[in-house]
């Protein structure tokens, strides 16, 4: 079914206010959920909202909490999110990283006691729109087996890198072949995954999203490489924030909350002039996209460039929402 941006935001806003979230906070949070969905990231927008409400009701998310700065070391700061609303706090932390970068050339904010930030790409994009390189990542509860194991002991720990090219070039990727949100999107659409995304119950690689959602044997991106990246990203976020690791979140908490996140902004213009920057980026993009195609009907894409098109389509035609997901939203 199709809904408008206004319908989405109103539904989110109503659910938040009915649970005691103050009107200003509810409006800002609903806006971010609606913008994420409008951008085409349904898995971490409308599809994720019922789970967000569940954590709000369980007390994992403290809606009136505000992040607090703990340590300041010039270009590096350490903050405590105090289990505040994840997407609003992440936006504030990237804004702070940008402010630090404006003074120092680079800014790094390490955040502890955070909640799920929903679409991580929003914060990389936020930096790139202002002309900065944006880098951020988060740890999570253990939802992926390390390479060679059956049992979940590492996080999907998504990493975002956004470049201020025209259009913005951005990688937003979990350390698994697919996020659990994308498994859900494909299952709801009745689609197999385009490539193997995990193991079935017999230990064979499978493209069936529902099987992987159930047994949680999701495949690390690049096999052992994604497994290793997940571990080191967790270590860095834990150390710099003095926060909880994947092991601590999984073993000590009843759900995924109190996680650790990193936000980095780099002011490119302190290192290279604008025309030179633009020319170098354009040459990279042209060199990649003019490679001989393996399939003449399949264009060579650059990461993140599809979001501008998706946003325009959703604004023109309405936002596609799965019927069952919309029913859940309406029932909240």
Swiss-Prot record:
SUPFAM superfamilies: L-sulfolactate dehydrogenase-like
Protein name: 2,3-diketo-L-gulonate reductase
Record key words, sorted: Cytoplasm, NAD, Oxidoreductase
Active site: 44
Entry's EC annotation: 1.1.1.130
Family: Belongs to the LDH2/MDH2 oxidoreductase family. DlgD subfamily.
Residues the record lists as binding NAD(+): 168-174, 224-225, 304-306
InterPro entries named among the record's database cross-references: Diketo_gul_Rdtase, Mal/L-sulf/L-lact_DH-like_ah, Mal/L-sulf/L-lact_DH-like_NADP, Mal/L-sulfo/L-lacto_DH-like_sf, Malate/L-lactate_DH-like
Protein's gene: dlgD
Biological role stated in the UniProt entry: Catalyzes the reduction of 2,3-diketo-L-gulonate in the presence of NADH, to form 3-keto-L-gulonate.
Transmembrane segments: none
Subunit (UniProt): Homodimer.
Catalytic activity: 3-dehydro-L-gulonate + NAD(+) = 2,3-dioxo-L-gulonate + NADH + H(+); 3-dehydro-L-gulonate + NADP(+) = 2,3-dioxo-L-gulonate + NADPH + H(+)
GO CC entries: cytoplasm
Gene Ontology terms, MF aspect: 3-dehydro-L-gulonate 2-dehydrogenase activity; NAD+ binding
Domain of life from the UniProt record: Bacteria
Any matching Pfam family: Ldh_2
Subcellular location per the Swiss-Prot or TrEMBL entry: Cytoplasm
